Amino acid sequence: LDLQEAISQSCDVYFYNLGEQLGISNISQFAREAGFGQRTGINLPNESKGLIPDKDWKLKRFGQPWQGGETVITAIGQGYVTTTPVQIARFVSALINGGHLLRPQLELNVSPEVQSMLPMEDKHRKFITQSMIHTVQSKRGTARSLRMQNATIGAKTGTAQVVRLSEEHENKDTEDIPYLLRDHAWMASFGFRDNASYVVVVLVEHGGSGSSTAGPIVKDIYEYLFIEDS
């Protein structure tokens, strides 16, 4: 399984191994430079910074040393990691706009404000966007339900664990698990058609699987957007 297929099929084990090789310092440094763990500056009150953990944070917060197992779960965005939909949207926007991390705006006709650049080479940024497109177009891609005629969609599904489930619940279907214990469902995406481009990020709290819960919402949004454009 190569990196593109690991992204397309959402293979946690691949990223466990990659995270172990990179180490928590490299992971946390990249995430912060990519805009996570800090406010985006959107003109809304009470924006959350989210959290990108590292060894120093854990020692200060809990008085305990960092454990190797915490690195591998951080590598897939679990554990102590918290992010917001607008942070994810800004990151995806940077993937498709040349690497510019923009301050999110609610007003129309406002000139974009570049805050910083993604800390990656263009070839790596383009590889990620192509892998997200592959996630939609591949027969085994977790976002294959987003395929549309006359439009190019790229996406990444996500499932964020809320709590560690007890043996009583861990093998149950989502609908059989108490609501507040269910995973959060994510889908981050971009879409192109003619001269129009969009970023759509959906979080369904306690929604279970990203592909089955957030996916249909994302597709409905694109169908509306592209109908409006035409």
Placement of each model-derived feature along the sequence:
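Beta-lactam-recognizing serine transpeptidase/beta-lactamase-like catalytic domain environment
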Residues: L1-V201
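Short amphipathic alpha-helical face segments that pack within enzyme cores
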Residues: T84-R90, T213-D220
